[in-house]
C-alpha cells in the first residue's frame, strides 16, 4: 500500500480532511461503511482527488492506523511523565492503560485494530505497527537497563498478548471499570513474570525524564 505524501499545506489539509471523514464513517458504520464513494460524499472531496493521495481503501485505513498509533504514543509519553520513577511494572501499566483509554475514547478504531474480517493488506499494516511497538518496547527496556537477559521469547510476544487481551476486552460489552480490571490483571501477570529477569534499575526504577530520553532515542540501524 502506497500513498502520495502531501507537501503543500493545502494538500496536507485535504489528507487530514479525508482521514477525518474516514474516522467519522468508521464510527457510524464500521469498516464496511468506509468506501471511497461514501468518503467522497461525506468529505466533499472528489473520488479522483482521494485517489491522488491514497491508492485504495486499504491505504486510507493504513494511514488512519498510523495516526492512531501516533496519538497513542503521545498518550504514553504523557502517562510516563506523570510518574516519579519508571520501573518495568509502572512502565507496563502506563503503556497498557494509555492504550485502553485511547480505545475507550475512539471505539471506531477497535474493529480495525482487532477485527478479523479485514483485507490481508490491513492485517499486514496492523502487524507492521505491532512490530514497531515491539521494537520500541525492546529498545526502551534494554536502553534503560531494566532487563539484561530476558526470557527466550521477545517483546513481540508481549505485544501480541496485549492484542489478544484488548480483542477479548472489546469482544462483548463491558463497563470501563471491568475493562480496566482485566488490563490491571494482565499487567500484574506480565510484570510479575518479567521481574524475574529485571535488574535493580528495572525494580527500583529511573526518573521519567531519564526514561523518556531512552524512549525517544533513534533506533539503531
Task: Provide a role label for each language-model segment.
Residues 63, 77-104, 158, 183:
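Hydrophobic alpha-helical connector segments
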Residues 1-13, 198-221:
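N-terminal intrinsically disordered/low-complexity leader segments
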Residues 44-54:
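Short hydrophobic/aromatic patch on the recognition helix
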Residues 89-94, 104-135, 176:
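Short secondary-structure transition hinges
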Residues 26, 61-68, 75-76, 110, ...:
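Alpha-helical DNA-contacting segments of helix-turn-helix folds
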Residues 36, 47-49, 61, 65-69, ...:
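Membrane-embedded alpha-helical bundles of multi-pass transporters/translocases
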Residues 1-29, 36-38, 42, 59:
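Basic, helix-initiating cap at the start of DNA-binding domains
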Residues 111, 115, 123, 143-189, ...:
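Hydrophobic/aromatic-rich alpha-helical bundle segments in the mid-to-C-terminal region
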Amino acid at each position: 500500500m502506497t500513498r502520495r505524501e502531501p507537501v503543500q499545506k493545502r494538500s496536507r489539509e485535504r489528507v487530514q480532511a479525508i482521514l477525518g471523514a474516514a474516522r467519522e464513517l468508521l464510527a457510524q458504520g464500521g469498516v464496511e461503511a468506509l468506501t471511497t464513494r461514501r468518503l467522497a460524499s461525506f468529505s466533499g472531496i472528489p473520488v479522483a482527488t482521494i485517489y491522488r493521495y491514497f491508492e485504495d481503501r486499504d491505504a486510507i485505513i493504513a494511514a488512519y492506523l498510523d495516526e492512531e498509533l501516533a496519538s497513542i504514543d503521545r498518550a504514553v509519553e504523557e502517562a510516563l511523565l506523570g510518574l516519579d520513577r519508571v520501573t518495568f511494572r509502572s512502565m507496563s501499566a502506563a503503556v497498557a492503560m494509555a492504550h485502553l483509554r485511547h480505545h475507550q475514547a475512539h471505539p471506531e478504531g477497535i474493529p480495525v485494530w482487532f477485527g478479523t474480517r479485514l483485507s490481508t493488506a490491513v492485517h499486514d499494516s496492523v502487524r507492521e505497527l505491532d512490530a514497531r511497538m515491539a521494537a520500541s518496547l525492546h529498545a526502551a527496556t534494554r536502553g534503560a537497563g531494566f532487563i539484561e537477559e530476558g526470557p527466550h521469547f521477545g517483546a513481540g510476544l508481549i505485544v501480541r498478548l496485549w492484542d489478544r487481551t484488548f480483542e477479548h476486552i472489546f469482544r462483548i460489552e463491558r463497563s470501563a471499570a471491568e475493562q480496566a480490571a482485566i488490563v490491571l490483571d494482565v499487567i500484574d501477570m506480565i510484570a510479575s513474570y518479567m521481574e524475574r529477569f529485571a535488574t535493580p534499575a528495572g525494580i527500583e526504577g529511573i526518573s521519567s525524564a531519564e526514561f523518556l530520553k531512552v524512549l525517544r532515542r533513534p533506533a539503531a540501524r
